[in-house]
Amino acid sequence: MDGSHHDWLEGRGPKLVLMGYIDDATSTVEARFYDHEGTVPALDSFRSWVQRYGIPCSVYLDKHTTYRSPQTPTVEEQLQGREQSQSQFQRAMSELGVEVIHAHSPAAKGRIERLFQTLQDRLVKELRLAKASSLAEANQVLERYLPLHNQRFQVEAAQPTDLHRRVPARLDLNTVLCLKTQRRLNADSTVQHEGHVYLVEDRLKAQTVMVHQRLDGSIHLRCHNRALSYRLVPQRPPKAPPLVNPVLAQTFLNCLGFARNPDDC
């Protein structure tokens, strides 16, 4: 898994990043275009793979900060025995039981890089023929191209057993492939997150709740894996500045600027 930064549309539209996956066993490829490489594109593209093929045993990727957090581990993470802080992507992989393997050299990324070289030739030509000039159009071309690519380059696995796991029936991927942030529950049952205030309507004894921001942008609050009822607290409009009489204000300024004796005012 990796992201390819390339002028895929050859100047006809915005710069795009191709999030690509290639299966070690069969060379099956899955990919999707995004406007940047980051946590949400990584989670969204991984979701596409899981929905199509199942949950892989491991995922091989580079040391991009999306996939490997540069931050020092928190106290909670240290108590859990982690030597490094987890990125949102690492946390999601851990919850799904997927081993994360980081590439330590350019040679270790050779397979995905060779795939990108192929796509930068073949796929770019398809995009050119379709006159794709936007993110949506590029993904439409990609959806038509990938089955043809896999039909040509896909191989039989050395072992017939598919090591992908099915998504458990009770597992909602939305609760895993999302952005999770722990927030303090205030005494008035409110939670603050990214400039918004949410009022939790359930009675809780907990001091913290988890804020889930899903890939569609929606917000969900959970506590101990239970969904919470809440409502957004409307923000109060900023107070208007006091009205000032322009005549009195000008008189006051004149006194400050020109009066040498207070009796002159």
Which ranges hold each PLM region?
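RNase H-like DDE/DDD metal-dependent nuclease/strand-transfer catalytic core used by mobile genetic elements
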Residues: 3-18, 24-136, 264-265
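Hydrophobic alpha-helical segments, especially N-terminal targeting/anchoring helices
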Residues: 22-23, 213
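Short helix-capping and hinge/turn segments at secondary-structure transitions, especially at repeat
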Residues: 121-128, 132, 143-158
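C-terminal, beta-rich DNA-binding module of retroviral/retroelements integrases
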Residues: 146-265
